[in-house]
Amino acid sequence: MRPSQRELGTLVFLLIISVCVSMPAFAFENEPDGFRGIKWGTNISELPDMSLSEDYGNSKFYLRKGEKLKIGDADIDRIGYGFYKGLFYSVGIMYNGSLNFKKLKAIFVEQYGQAQQQKQFGEHYSWLGETVKIAVRYNEIAKSGDIWYVFKPLEKEQEKDDEQKAKKGAKDL
């Protein structure tokens, strides 16, 4: 017995709904186009107030001279700006203390909406956008945490480059 068009339509509708429900959200409120006035993809040569902190070849991390080490009334220990092949693609923010974590989490929820909570050691909240992903983490044992912004297009380029390096390296075996 063949299903009717109505039954097929219902089946297709249910399949579409189940796929949509199971897919992670790819947008969040106020997805940032940069951080503290620096747009994603900006060339490091355009930012004279940056000083090199860590050099990993194509990935380099900089500190900004005169950086404001506060977000709202939360105290920040350090903000590092990541560049891949000279282009701005990530921010790493380090902080200490549960009080700062609570303040920062509230600020990020206010700015970006409800987060996805990850089941990991400590607390981990994330926002996954079309072009940016953000993670706020806190380790209760170490009493410290970090926040990461990552510009996904340059992250994908970095992953492809790393994959090519691994393939080349595998030939040495």
Task: Walk through the language-model features, giving the residues of each.
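Bacterial N-terminal signal peptides that target proteins for export
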Residues: 2-12
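Non-cytosolic coordination micro-motifs
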Residues: 3-5, 27-65, 92-173
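Bacterial N-terminal signal peptides
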Residues: 11-22
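Extracytoplasmic
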Residues: 35, 74-78, 86-88, 122
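Surface-exposed acidic loop/strand-edge motifs in secreted or periplasmic proteins
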Residues: 61-80, 92
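A general beta-strand register signal
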Residues: 70, 83, 126-128
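Hydrophobic/aromatic beta-strand elements that line small-molecule binding cavities or substrate pockets
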Residues: 77-82, 136-138
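A short, structured loop/turn motif at beta-sheet edges
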Residues: 83-85, 113
